[in-house]
Amino acid sequence: MSQKTERPVLSGQRIKTRKRDEREKYDPTGFRDAVIAGLEKTEGDLEQISKYLDSAGNKLDYRRYGEVLFDILIAGGLLVPGGSISQDGEKPRTSYCIFDAPESMESMRNHEQVFVKLIRRYKYLEKMFEEEMGKVLLFVKGFTPSERIKLARMTALWLVNGSVPPNVLLVLNNEHLIKDGIALEFLLELFQTFKQEKGIAYLIQALKKGGLESKLMDFFPPNKRTEEYFKQVFLDKELNEIVKLHKAQASQEAKRELQQALIDDINDEKPYNEITSDIKDFSQRTNIPDHEIIVIIWSTIMSLGEWNKKEELVTDQAVRHLKNYCPLLQAFASTDRSELALILKVQEFCYENMNFMKAFQKIILLFYKTEVLSEEIILRWYKEGHSNKGKMHFLEQMRKFVEWLQSAEEESESEDEQKNGE
C-alpha cells in the first residue's frame, strides 16, 4: 500500500493567505452609515429608495449585513436589545423608514412594495428577513405605541404576501410582552389588518398553519385569561370567527381529555356507574352534548380492542367486546340524536376498517337487544338517516332485520287496533 509523500517545506518560508480566504472585519456601523447616506439622497421617495437598494446590493455586502439592512428599513437605524437605536456615529438614524411613515394603510402598502422588490431581487434575503422579524417582534415593548401599530400592520401585510411565515408570531408568547397586554394589543391590530386585506377565512387558515389556533389564550395577561374576557375582546374588534375557532379548539382539547380519562378509568376497572357519573360531570363542565359524548365512548372502547386479523373471527370478537360496554353506551343514548350519531359512527368505523364490514348488522342487533338503540331510530337510519359510506352494503346487511322490525311493528299496531275495537 503506497503512502502519500510529504512535500518539502522551506524553513522560514511564510505562506501567504489568499485574498479570498481573508475576511474583512465585521463593521455593522460602517454598513449602516453607507445605507443611511444612500437613503438620504432619495429624500424619502419610495421608488427611488427601491432603485437605490437594488443597485447598492452590488457594492454593499447584503449577505453579511442583511439583518442591519432590515433594522434600518424598519426602525431607521441599528436596533440594540430592548428595541432602542444605537447612537454610535455622526448620523445613527434616518427618518426614511417604516417607523417614521404615516400609519395609513396606503402608506404601509407602499412600504411593503419596497421590501417585496428588495427580496425578489436578492432571494437570499428571504431567510434573513424571517430571522430579523423574530428578533424585531421581541423588541416591541421598546417601541412607541405608534411604532407598534405600524409594525403590526406591516407584519400583517408580510404574512399575507408570504414574506414571513405565521409561526413567527409565536415569539410574542413571551412573559414580559404578555403581562402588560402588549402582545395581545399587537396581535389584535395585526388580525384586524389581515382580515381587512385578505378576509377572515385566510386569517383562520394562517393561524392554523402557524400553530396559533390552540394558543390564543396564552397571549392574554394571566389575570385576564377567562372565556368571557376572551370573547369580549375579539367581538369588540369584530373578530367573531376567532371566538368560534377558540371554542372549537377548546372543545377538541376537552374531548381528548375525556377520552384519556375514560381509558384510565377502564384500565383501573372502575365501576360503570362511577364512570358514567364522571363523564356526566365532565360534560356539564365542558358543554359537550350527549351525541358527541357517545361517539367518544365508541371510539375509545374500540381503540382498546386487540382485533383478530381474520374477518370471519372479528365479528364475534367485536360483539363480545362491546357487550361489556353496553350499560355505558346506554347511559348516553338519551336522545334520538345521540342514538343516530352512534349508528352513523358504527357505520363509519365498519366502512373504514375492512375486517368489520360484515360485523355491522351484528353490532346494531346487540345494541337493539341491550336497549342502547331503539327500533324507531334503527328504522329512521335505514330509510333516510344513513351516510353514503358503504351505503348499499350496509343497507343490504340490515334488510332482513329491518323487515323483521317492520313486521313486528305492524303486528303490534294490529293488536292495538283489535283492543281498541273490543
Curated annotation (Swiss-Prot):
Carrying Phosphoserine, the residues are S407, S412, S414
SMART domains per record: eIF5C (SM00515)
Q: Where is this region: Disordered?
A: 1-26
Mind telling me which InterPro entries this protein's record contains? ARM-type_fold, eIF5-mimic_regulator, W2_BZW1/2, W2_domain
Task: Enumerate the transmembrane spans.
Answer: none
Q: Name one GO biological process term.
A: long-term memory
Hey, which family's this protein in?
Belongs to the BZW family.
User: What exactly does this protein do?
Assistant: May be involved in memory formation.
Q: What is this protein called?
A: Protein krasavietz
Source organism per UniProt: Drosophila melanogaster (Fruit fly)
